[in-house]
């Protein structure tokens, strides 16, 4: 009887293994694609070997594997073969559509007004990237003299133009030329406040130099050379706030407190709810790992004396705008967004791209990003993937020092071994906390 049961168990095990690997991606065996690559991500059984179109695939110790196949225009046949199973995938890649260059249309200067707060003023007529040079306030008066696609060209000064989305402005008639009223400056222990007043709302730009910030207000209706510049010395570690009410700009630049007990840190667990984030080789959802790390980090920082605010403490949907508003309402000094990375539709080596990277947008956050990237890699044992710039919504505000930490790559088999370990969340949390301590305390 015992021999019979043993034989049955061995038979069932063999039957299960004969099915072979489990693919998380791709989800369909046949697809029409505009992508340059097809990604194969999944888990292999013990002792299983896999090849994709004849190329042997590396399998991590936990069974995780990943591979990318470059797609040519037209039919693509991909054979995934193991010693247990063979599957065939078919992709049809559409021919790329050649982009048509849209010309700039010039026209006589006319006046428009910004119709909502936080309207991006850009250096180029492109909706995306690092081209934001200001975020304009509602009722700001602008002069436009051209258009390209969905953007108007904004005339700021004789040697300065910018671009704003057509949807962000409304036409107005009979605008009166603004006049300068006054300028004032006040210094406090850890902050400097400067004001500059006009008879109506005017556009501005920011330019960060090594030791100062140039805050420029433009009055092109008066003349092409009417530019008012505030030269604001900046501390080593700082953040700033800009407000505009009835033509008066208030610019406040604050020095970051040097004691953790005086710091408010917003800990942001990326994604959540229906936003799953990236999917790992073994089928894990990024949102859950993000939350686990965030909870560990929050507890660590509270123990160290920091005031901690979380954007989510459970698996729920929180919009990007709400995450930013949480930080602003709580007067956050530091914002840390926690994520795991994945490979996009670009010619990356799926095995080379691994480890921890940290993103920042504003120059005041660069040093903090460098410290945290080094600290997380040291504590978590991840490869250092670098410090980079990106226009992520949660780190764009200048009201705080903000970074987004990509702790590891969900789609990398070696990283999969790390982020699936029980200690990963605690190690990453310690790395971020150590980075905050070093950055805040190293005045």
Language-model segments: what does each one mean?
Residues 12-22:
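Bacterial Sec-dependent signal peptides at the C-terminal "C-region" and cleavage site
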Residues 279-443:
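Active-site-proximal helix/loop segments of hydrolytic enzymes
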């Amino acid at each position: 009887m015992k021999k019979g049961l043993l034989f049955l168990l061995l038979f069932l095990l063999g039957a299960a293994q004969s099915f072979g690997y489990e693919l998380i991606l791709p989800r369909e065996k046949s697809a029409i694609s505009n992508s340059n690559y097809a990604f194969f991500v999944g888990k292999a059984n013990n002792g299983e070997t896999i090849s994709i179109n004849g190329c042997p695939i590396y399998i991590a110790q936990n069974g995780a594997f990943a591979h990318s196949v470059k797609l040519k225009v037209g039919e693509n046949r991909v054979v995934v073969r193991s010693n247990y199973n063979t599957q065939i995938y078919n992709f049809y890649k559409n021919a790329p559509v050649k982009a048509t260059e849209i010309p700039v249309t010039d026209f006589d200067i006319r006046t428009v007004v910004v119709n909502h707060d936080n309207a991006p003023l850009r250096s180029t007529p492109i909706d995306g990237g690092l081209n934001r040079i200001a975020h304009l306030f509602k009722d700001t008066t602008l002069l436009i003299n051209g258009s390209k696609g969905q953007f108007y060209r904004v005339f700021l000064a004789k040697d300065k133009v910018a671009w704003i989305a057509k949807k962000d402005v409304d036409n107005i008639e009979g605008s009166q030329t603004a006049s300068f009223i006054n300028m004032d400056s006040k210094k406090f222990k850890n902050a400097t406040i400067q004001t500059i007043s006009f008879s109506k709302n005017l556009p501005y730009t920011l330019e960060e130099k090594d030791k100062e910030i140039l805050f420029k207000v433009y009055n092109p209706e008066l003349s092409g050379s009417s530019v008012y510049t505030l030269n604001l010395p900046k501390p080593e570690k700082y953040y700033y706030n800009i407000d505009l009410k009835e033509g008066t700009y208030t610019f406040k630049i604050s020095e970051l407190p040097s004691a953790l007990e005086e710091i408010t840190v917003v800990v942001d667990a990326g994604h959540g709810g229906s936003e799953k984030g990236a999917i790992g080789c073994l089928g894990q959802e990024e949102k859950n790992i993000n939350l686990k790390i965030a909870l560990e980090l929050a507890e660590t920082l509270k123990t160290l004396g920091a005031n901690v605010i979380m954007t989510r403490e459970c698996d729920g949907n929180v919009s990007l705008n709400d995450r930013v508003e949480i930080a602003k309402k709580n007067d956050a000094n530091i914002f840390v967004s926690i994520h795991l990375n994945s490979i996009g539709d670009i010619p990356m080596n799926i095995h080379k791209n691994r480890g921890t990277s940290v993103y920042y947008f504003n120059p005041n956050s660069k040093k903090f990003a460098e410290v945290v990237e080094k600290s997380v890699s040291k504590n978590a044992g991840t490869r250092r993937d670098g410090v980079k710039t990106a226009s992520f919504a949660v780190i764009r505000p200048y009201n705080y020092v903000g970074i987004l930490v990509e702790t590891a790559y969900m789609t990398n088999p070696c990283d999969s071994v790390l982020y699936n370990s029980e200690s990963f969340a605690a190690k990453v949390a310690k790395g971020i906390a150590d980075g905050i301590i070093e950055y805040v305390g190293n005045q």
